Structures are given as C-alpha cells and as structure tokens.
Amino acid sequence: NSAWCALRDSVTETGDGIRMALWAGAELEAGGACMIWNRAILPDGFEFNEDRMGGDIFLPGSQPFLHVNVNGERFMNEDQCYPMSYAAGANQPKHYSWIVWDGNYWDDIAQFDTCGCSRLYPAPSGTAFNADVYDCEAMSKEHLDEFWLNPRLEAGTLKKADTLEALADMMEFDADQKATFLATVERYNGLVAAGEDTDFGKPAYRLSDVGTAPFYAARIGGELLVTIHGVITDVNSQPLKNDGTPIEGLYVCGNDQGGFYPHNYPSNFTGINAGRTATFARIAAKHALGVE
C-alpha cells in the first residue's frame, strides 16, 4: 500500500525512460504497481501527509532485528523479505515500526547472514556483496558506523542509550507503552536464549539478544524502490505499439521494461532484477547489431 510509503523521492526514479517510450508511441503494461521496502528511517514527529518531510534512506533497516510497534509490542517474524516487512509495519498503529538492537550488532549481522542488497557483512567468497550497494565502499563495522549509524545519530533519527529504560524514553513511549516494551524485550531475550521463537517462528540464527549496552532504536517505514510494471516489448526488447508492431530502432530494458513481474517483486530471489536487466540488454544489443 503506497499510502504508507514514507520516502517517495529519488533523483533516479522519475520515470523518464517510460515516458520517452510512451512519447514514441509505445504501449504501457496495464495495472501500475511499485515495490516498497523497509529502508526509510523517520524523524520524530513524522507525519504521512503530502510532504512527508525528514525521512532518509537507512540500509540497516532490512536486518532482522527485533521490531516493535508504537505500543512497544512485537508483532511479526522479522525474517521477512523487504516488502512483507514493510507491509507488516505499515499495518501497525501510525503505520511504522521501531527496529531495536544492542551493542553486539556487528556480530548479530554476521550471524544473520542476509543476502542480496541487505547484506552488511563481508561474504566469504569475496563477491561484490562485500561492498556497500550505495557507495561501493568495502563493508565493515567501521564503514557501517561512519556511513550509516553516526550521521543518523547526529541527526537524531537513530536513538542510542545506555539502558533500555532510557531508550524507551527516547522512543517517546508513555508509561504503559514503556512497560510493554521492556516486557517485550525480556520475552524476546528469553526466546533467543531458548533458541526457539515460539511466538512468531523466526529461525534461530536470525534471533539476536537485546541485552548489551548501548542500545539502539530506529523508526522504520517504507521507501519506494522501483516500478514493477513498464513498457510492453517483443522478444528483442523493442517496444510495441498498441497494434502489436515494434517501434524500430528503439529498445527498452531494465526497470522500464514490462512483462516480467506479475505485479510483485520477489526479493527472495537475489539478483533477479539485475539479472533480467543484463539479459534483456544483451538481447537488445545483439538485435541492434544484427548478430545471432
């Protein structure tokens, strides 16, 4: 539901490619849709109005740390793909959630072993996932702190405290919400110690204790990632007019190309969008060059 997408602006996601194809006479796939993921960190006082001011992108938002709502309650198995995690939080009161972790976060991130563009810990194979997907710098705890955590701490969007009680105050919980939050963390830590999430079924290796100071919390909402519909093309990646004939000399690939996603972005298939972009671009280039 894009109504609760907190971060909608991007200099790279303005639809120019699709517009240019339509101006040339191409046909747009029916049923527009977009993919929203859990990468927006929200400031105090954030409101879902027309402006939606103050949100920022936050790569660690996709880590499966403890999530609680504005009442301090855990409400989900946090080991979800991006849009499902966003949707779960968007359906909570005020349409966002808090993600909570402790001072052992780097060890926890290594244990989580997430893949794709949520990966923060260097991969043992030495692949491209060892680089931050946003600035291509080598991933490390120092980089995570310098590039992602410290600037948000300075901005006040990321909360940090020496005790859970103080953290709850920074999260603006009232007395009842604070008591619920502290009980939630205690319950969650018990599940971690037991090695089994009997509340929501999160796998044991994605459970992480919240017990070592300092403690952190971030208000997480949805960020617009990508359109998942686009221009209708033929097998050569040439856009089609409404009569089904191709527009010669024009090719549409990548996110501007339709007919690939059934109005759902399957983010549990790592690299699916990059893979289809490279594949259909190669097909288009070969056709343009007249080679088999």
Which residue stretches match the model-derived regions?
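A glycine-rich dinucleotide-binding beta-alpha-beta segment and adjacent secondary-structure elements
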Residues: 163-166, 170, 174-264
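An anion/pyrophosphate-binding glycine-rich loop and adjacent beta-alpha core
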Residues: 18, 24-173
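Glycine-rich loop(s) and the adjacent beta-strand/alpha-helix scaffold that form part
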Residues: 1-44, 86, 268, 274-283
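Short, ordered coil/turn segments that flank beta-strands lining enzyme active or ligand-binding pockets
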Residues: 70-71, 235, 242, 279
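Glycine-rich phosphate/pyrophosphate-binding beta-alpha loops
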Residues: 37-41, 83-86, 222-226, 256-274
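Short Gly/Pro-enriched turn/cap motifs at secondary-structure boundaries
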Residues: 8-10, 53-59, 89-90, 220-223, ...
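Short beta-alpha connecting loops at secondary-structure transitions
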Residues: 2-6, 48-53, 149-152, 264-273
